[in-house]
Amino acid sequence: MSRELMVQDSGDTIGNTPLVLLRNISKGLDARIAVKVEYLNPSCSVKDRIAKSMVDEAEKAGTIVPGKTVLVEGTSGNLGIALAHIGKIRGYKVILVMPATMSVERRAMLRAYGAEVILSDPAEGHPGVIKKVEMLVDKLPNAHCLDQFSNPANPAAHYRTTGPEIWRQTEGKVDIVCFGVGSSGTVTGVGRYLREQNPNIEIYPVEPYESSVLSGLPRGPHKIQGIGAGIVPGNVDRSLFTEILRIKSDDAMQMARRLADEEAILGGISSGANVVAAVELASRPENKGKLIVTTVNSFAERYFTTELYSDVLNEVSQLTFSSDDEAMGIAKKYLGL
């Protein structure tokens, strides 16, 4: 929906996010990199698109009913927040199960939207989350799981919205896309749409180096919240893939900080992973002159208690009020005077 018009509720503002060139990070590279700033969706992540799509389709099918159905979902955080947001608008009780390693900010946002949060043992990984979700759905009255990992309404959201937006915003000149794989909705939905427009477009899924399940390697611990669930999602369409890119957690975090410092774009860790992948692709000689598009998936504010911004949080937590002389000293130090 157009953001130029007044809307009925905040759910109507989902989508039509801007596409921004990375002018500084791409300096010295022979390809251009642009990012869809998905944290400008109402609950501040790309997952707003699929939460609305899955709820819409389930309502049309009569599978869920506002005011009656309890939505129970496993999440690393962003889908849960998006589902809590749309649930609040539509009148659903929402229960989210997430690993205990996910950030405190995510838990707080879920509670702020009125959802219930249940933590699972991180050692059990995604299977542990699913086991808890299945137990709750089985034993709670009127409970239903939308299951983002295998729900076709997930990639369909990106096929209907994100893909066409990228095609329109680049005037059909996009050559390459790369997206982190959590539930696989973005890479599958966008990939399908763009391949229909141009069969030569290259599509690169991105996964954590430390947990490269898509690549056929064992599941392992990593720091890139939101991708690398340790399973191959049902929504994966390998026929679309040009090549799977494996990105290290530390590289993803460093790039997320660079995005803030060099581009004034505050994305999370998976956003950093996407841009690391885009830079890797832009560095390849065969991609000279090409346009590479990826996403900034979520806003950095929900990562301040994680390793990504813990140094900043610790620093500002220790600030105290200053005298005029101290204030001048702080200002001069900041300005290098």
UniProtKB/Swiss-Prot annotation:
Chain positions with N6-(pyridoxal phosphate)lysine modification: 47
Keyword Metal-binding: no
Taxonomic superkingdom: Eukaryota
SUPFAM superfamilies associated with the record: Tryptophan synthase beta subunit-like PLP-dependent enzymes (SSF53686)
InterPro entries assigned to the protein according to its UniProt record, in alphabetical order: Cys_synth, Cys_Synth/Cystath_Beta-Synth, CysK, P-phosphate_BS, TrpB-like_PALP, TrpB-like_PALP_sf
GO biological process: cysteine biosynthetic process from serine
Cofactor(s) the protein needs: pyridoxal 5'-phosphate
Pathway in which this enzyme or protein is active: Amino-acid biosynthesis; L-cysteine biosynthesis; L-cysteine from L-serine: step 2/2
Positions bound to pyridoxal 5'-phosphate: 78, 182-186, 270
Keyword Repressor in record: no
TM segment ranges: none
Classification via Pfam families: PALP (PF00291)
One MF term in the entry's GO annotations: cysteine synthase activity
GO-annotated cellular components: cytoplasm
The EC number(s) this enzyme carries: 2.5.1.47
Keywords: Amino-acid biosynthesis, Cysteine biosynthesis, Pyridoxal phosphate, Transferase
Catalytic reaction equation(s): O-acetyl-L-serine + hydrogen sulfide = L-cysteine + acetate
Subunit structure: Homodimer.
Function statement: Primarily catalyzes the formation of cysteine and acetate from O-acetylserine and hydrogen sulfide. Can also catalyze the formation of cysteine and acetate from S-sulfocysteine and hydrogen sulfide and the formation of cyanoalanine and hydrogen sulfide from either S-sulfocysteine or O-acetylserine and hydrogen cyanide.
UniProt cross-references to NCBIfam families, sorted A to Z: cysK, cysKM
Name of the protein in question: Cysteine synthase 3
Species whose genome carries this gene: Caenorhabditis elegans
